[in-house]
Amino acid sequence: MKNAPLTLNFGSVRLPVSADGLLHAPTAQQQLGLTQSWEAALVEHGLPETYRDFGAGPEAAVSVPDFVALAFALDTPEARRWQKRARELLARAMQGDVRVAAQIAERNPEPDARRWLAARLESTGARRELLATVARHGGEGRVYGQLGSISNRTVLGKDSASVRQERGVKATRDGLTSAELLRLAYIDTVTARAIQESEARGNAAILTLHEQVARSERQSWERAGQVQRVG
């Protein structure tokens, strides 16, 4: 049984793609309005010569980053259209257009990646709500960083700097799993609610409350883990 060809969809454009994510060079060449031979273009722009099987035997291929580099290096009408698309996409991303994230997620074939994005957004939203609650209740200065440290040590067993170094990320949350993100979101949500219900005010009261919440949740997770191991 022959597998259906893989494609990368960008708006109305459909680009054949190999199993490891390289684009079909003849199609890319047409999309960019490149009239010179593909081999000459590779030499001129210092790109590697690569081949993949797109269903009819080995054919020239190009990576997505190299395709983008060509799109900005060329001055054809087709390349300028790609440049315009890129500028519009960057502007939307900088303005926080969530439809950009949705479109990217839809193109990702991995269900785990989409679940991670949902957990990442939930975690970010919970943290923002916690910080807003802290500000309304007189929190200021170092308390914001201290809250994050307590949460990270509770969920991850280490501080943010260690996590970033070990997992090779610049932003701590980018290196966390879906489960870790959801646990952080839960702790932040419970703390925000507790601050409001107890009417806690000031850094000391807020930190004490957050430590109590974090300790309670940690103990709950540890008990749940012990039950699962026994079962």
UniProtKB/Swiss-Prot annotation:
Disruption phenotype: Cells lacking this gene show a normal growth rate, do not exhibit a decrease in the efficiency of natural transformation, and is as resistant to ionizing radiation as wild-type. However, deletion of the ddrC gene decreases the ionizing radiation resistance of the ddrB mutant strain or the recA mutant strain, and appears to increase that of the pprA mutant strain. Moreover, cells lacking both ddrC and ddrD exhibit a slight (two-fold) increase in sensitivity to ionizing radiation, but this phenotype is apparent only at the highest applied doses. It is found in: Cytoplasm, Nucleoid. This is DNA damage response protein C. The keyword rRNA-binding does not apply. Homodimer. Keywords: Cytoplasm, DNA damage, DNA repair, Stress response. Induction: Induced to high levels following extreme ionizing radiation exposure. Is induced after gamma-irradiation in an IrrE/DdrO dependent manner. Also highly induced in response to desiccation stress. Disulfide bonds: none annotated. NCBIfam families: repair_DdrC. Appears to contribute to D.radiodurans capacity to survive exposure to ionizing radiation. Likely functions as a DNA damage-induced nucleoid-associated protein (NAP) that contributes to the enhanced level of nucleoid compaction after irradiation by bridging DNA duplexes, thereby limiting the dispersion of the fragmented genome immediately after irradiation to facilitate subsequent DNA repair. In vitro, binds both ssDNA and dsDNA, and is able to compact circular DNA, circularize linear DNA, anneal complementary DNA strands and protect DNA from nucleases. Changing residue 81 to E: Retains two distinct DNA binding sites similar to wild-type DdrC, with a high- and a low-affinity site, but shows a reduced high-affinity DNA binding site. The keyword Endoplasmic reticulum does not apply. Is composed of two domains, an unusual N-terminal wHTH motif and a more classical four-helix bundle at its C-terminus, which is domain swapped in the DdrC homodimer. The domain swapping creates an asymmetric dimer exhibiting two distinct DNA binding surfaces corresponding to a high- and a low-affinity DNA binding site. One of its GO terms (biological process) is DNA repair. One of its GO terms (cellular component) is cytoplasm.
